[in-house]
Amino acid sequence: MRIGVIGINHKLADLKLRDALAKACQKRFGANQSVHDQHHFILLSTCNRTEVYFSSHDLTATHSYLLSILRQDVKEDFDHKLYSFFGMDCFSHLTRVTSGLDSAIVAETEIQGQVKNAYNLATTFLCLPKELHFLFQKSMGIAKRIRSELHLGRGLPNLEHAILQTGKYFFRNTQQPKILFVGASEINRKILHFLKSKQYSDMTICNRSEIRSKELAILYGLHLLPWCQLDSWHQYDWIIFGTKSSEYLIKPEKNFIPADNDKLIMDLCVPRNVEPKLGQNAKITLLNIDQINRLLKIRHRGMTQALIEAENRVNLATYEHTNRYRQKEDSKITIFAASA
């Protein structure tokens, strides 16, 4: 199979470098940007990883092409922080990723939707080669089956629990903090739903799409803050950012910071939505996705045996599907040669 991937994740690089590479990849390899002659790409960008999957007749040339483009936009030395996989190793990697086995929060569920969205977005804008269709369709199918059969992650603390516990501790002397959600992403919707079930009622949504904001406001009984009024974020106690943006949405020098009460800001995004320098303000506690993920290390200890079994199933399934693919391609060549 002529497939490969080049990527960076939470294990290998800090947020600063991941920010820079995520912005460069979105600019150069986003679905509506990815017309690159004979090279074909699918970009998978989440808070914990940025990966470019590719297919071409010359994988080595495409790999070099990718690196040369990234070096134009990212000044920091990054080559030693990247990982690359080709062929069946690439297939196995994406299946592990989609299963949640390679996530910062082991066996998290959001990654399945993120992989599906990346694939669907690419197919909307691009005519992809059959190898990339095979890679994503099979990876999603295998991952779904493994998660279902092994019940991965069920009953264990997840990101919503970590966010709730952090908020409860921070606002232990506040009965109903004013909460602002910036963005209607899947993770923000899950957190919103979870906090609502825990009797948090003073919640506001701010999103680029007014239609989506109104839908969520009706569904959960939320207040609305128009996107053009995001600069008034400091009127809230607890601000949770979960939206895509190539630029910081709030910066220290741009926004007035009142001194009356402490703020808890959670930035769940890569690239980040919040300028890190904002955390230097004595009245602001700014937490990024890596800091929140560290609260959930207990998940891994509670799932050791299931994770081993999941890894074995990934390896077996990708091996079997790769062999079938090769046999099918070989039979086509044989038939073509016989008819020539």
From Swiss-Prot:
It catalyses: (S)-4-amino-5-oxopentanoate + tRNA(Glu) + NADP(+) = L-glutamyl-tRNA(Glu) + NADPH + H(+). Keywords: NADP, Oxidoreductase, Porphyrin biosynthesis. The active site is at C47. The keyword Phosphoprotein does not apply. It is an enzyme of class 1 (oxidoreductase). It holds the Pfam family Shikimate_DH. Substrate binds at T46, C47, N48, R49, S103, E108, T109, E110, Q114. It comes from the Bacteria. NADP(+) binds at G183, A184, S185, E186, I187, N188. Homodimer. Possesses an unusual extended V-shaped dimeric structure with each monomer consisting of three distinct domains arranged along a curved 'spinal' alpha-helix. The N-terminal catalytic domain specifically recognizes the glutamate moiety of the substrate. The second domain is the NADPH-binding domain, and the third C-terminal domain is responsible for dimerization. During catalysis, the active site Cys acts as a nucleophile attacking the alpha-carbonyl group of tRNA-bound glutamate with the formation of a thioester intermediate between enzyme and glutamate, and the concomitant release of tRNA(Glu). The thioester intermediate is finally reduced by direct hydride transfer from NADPH, to form the product GSA. Catalyzes the NADPH-dependent reduction of glutamyl-tRNA(Glu) to glutamate 1-semialdehyde (GSA). This is Glutamyl-tRNA reductase. The gene is hemA.
